[in-house]
Amino acid sequence: MSAAAKSQVPEEAAPGCEEEPKGKTLLTWGSLFGHRSEKIVFTKGDGSPEESLLTVTITETTVIESDLGVWSSRALIYLTLWFFFSFCTLFLNKYILSLLEGEPSMLGAVQMLSTTLIGCVKIFVPCCLYQHKTRLSYPPNFIMTMLFVGLMRFATVVLGLVSLKNVAVSFAETVKSSAPIFTVIMSRMILGEYTGLLVNLSLIPVMGGLALCTATEISFNILGFSAALSTNIMDCLQNVFSKKLLSGDKYRFSAPELQFYTSAAAVALLIPAWTFFMDIPVIGRSGKSFSYSQDIVLLLLTDGALFHLQSVTAYALMGKISPVTFSVASTVKHALSIWLSIIVFGNKITSLSAIGTILVTLGVLLYNKARQYQQETMQSLVTATSRNPEDDTEPLVPQDSRQHH
């Protein structure tokens, strides 16, 4: 290969000289799924038209996780707040749906409208320790992306409320125990996140422990089970897409921004459905006219505000950790929710619940160790690659072809 051809390699691979990937994207979702197109560069040699050099950059287009991950101070604060607001929202939802005979679609509408209005205030009015910065540019498929994520978000909320209305809290959380494995698959397909064998194996006690927590749950309902499983899949897909938007290199959204845009998109998509299919004055299962007393309105507004805080803290935490780590943290939250439901709603404690909790705790510890080992291994590989960059690129070109040209 000529000297001119060799000089092109560092220029193309320089991180500061990133260009948009050439070629046409498939439909309008190419930028979301095509994470590898921005990491691979083809360069032609001057000596032969058949000669080509493949350069793979090390920098990912999506920052999967920071160095400390969930153990950073800010991530721990977000995690604690997310747990707290999630518990408050969960039990208030159960109270409204069970004791007040509320409809899931009505409660979902209140939650989405509330979080949209509060998010609008936070975006356009400087408040709540958040100063919104005006964005100069948006992704080319911004509207379609937000509509898609917003639809998934609303579907997750409504399906979760349907499962909560038809089955016990503990059973709904048990069905969600398979979330980590769905997240591993989707994160690999969409973000290109690599999880090693040890990390994948550590997820088994996490999922199995949560399933054991309520293995004797007898309030099985096919509608509630189907809704809980659908919520699980939709939530994993939404989390992976949200991570792509929160941690992208070129277009990165803050947690309040993403929360507001997706909520507004969900409301815009589903206003016709609410108008034609919901009978607002009659929302009780018994069909009686619902009385909007001051206490009921206060409960609904409180539920909407708590749901907003839960969503914002979840997005903020998601921006700091990987989707798989977020899924493991969510599994821990589900296990704690089971024990809190036992305390609050008086469900019986079983030996399997205790064993399951121990397994979840052990699985989380194993996951942290496996994750740390994987990060150290990858860091050592990157260090070795940076010390001898030419040794990694030379074998990509046949030795004899460089001698003849």
UniProtKB/Swiss-Prot annotation:
GO terms for biological process: blastocyst hatching. It is found in: Membrane. Signal peptide: none annotated. It is a multi-pass membrane protein. Keywords: Membrane, Transmembrane, Transmembrane helix. It comes from the Eukaryota. GO terms for cellular component: membrane. Putative transporter. Belongs to the TPT transporter family. SLC35E subfamily. This is Solute carrier family 35 member E2A.
